[in-house]
């Protein structure tokens, strides 16, 4: 949600927050989920000095993509990819940072190429192979 609101890629937000802040946010997620989502985004913007960008996830060819996945849809996709590719001795936050800093995100976030719609195991295999 934060990335979409800011018109930034997920990589930007993850890197601006860093490991310690992401760890904290995951720990308090059950509380934050009961807060107003827009207020949470604004609080993150203020606290971490997040800036607006120029990446518009909805800027796709409508002939190739009739429905943009929701933030929740994408969160599920990335959560599965993180868990499916966790490395030995790597925690979830380290995996999250690793995935969001990988080129596969640009492929998955391009809803016109079909990668988003592939089953989880195909995305995990593509990540491990370094390409779709």
Predicted regions and their residues:
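Long protein-protein interaction modules used by eukaryotic assembly/scaffold proteins
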Residues: 75-97
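Amphipathic alpha-helical interaction segments
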Residues: 20, 24-29, 47-55, 84, ...
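Long, compositionally biased
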Residues: 30-70
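Short coil/turn segments at secondary-structure boundaries
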Residues: 15, 29, 57-60, 91-95
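Glycine-rich, aromatic-bearing surface loops/beta-hairpins
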Residues: 97-132
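Short, charged, surface-exposed loops that flank catalytic or proteolytic processing sites
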Residues: 6-12, 91, 113, 117
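N-terminal interaction modules that seed assembly of large macromolecular complexes
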Residues: 1-45
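Short, hydrophobic/amphipathic alpha-helical patches that form generic packing surfaces
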Residues: 1, 19-22, 72-83
